[in-house]
Amino acid sequence: MVVALALAALLVWTGRAQAQLLMVTGEYQVTNVDRAEQRIGIALRGDDPDRRQNWVHVRADTKIVRRVWLRGGAFRDEFMTWNGFFDYVRKGTKLKVHGGRNWDGTIQAKKIWL
């Protein structure tokens, strides 16, 4: 009985686990932007662009890279800030996301390529 109470108390004091279940990488299109909640709605490329399939949470430490194409087929990769990303991204923007899947099914972005 005492052991059961001790385990219950331990679970209450430690709080909810924040670990990520698995890492995912995929190519998506943006369906909506929720800057206030720091997230974007996504759908797989080729699926209905008006129907959100999942949320991707973008934090200040997320690495965001945008590829800029130059003349002659050359390109330059530019790092973007969090604010720059939310200013740039719109419905229909194509992107590649690498991150961890949270317990609720959403994706916590570690890297985003535009």
What are these regions (language model features)?
Residues 2-55, 69-114:
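Short, flexible, surface-exposed loop segments at domain boundaries
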Residues 61-63:
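Small-residue (G/S/T/A) turn/hinge positions that recur once per unit in extracellular repeat modules
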Residues 66:
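A short-motif feature that recognizes glycine-rich, charge-decorated loops
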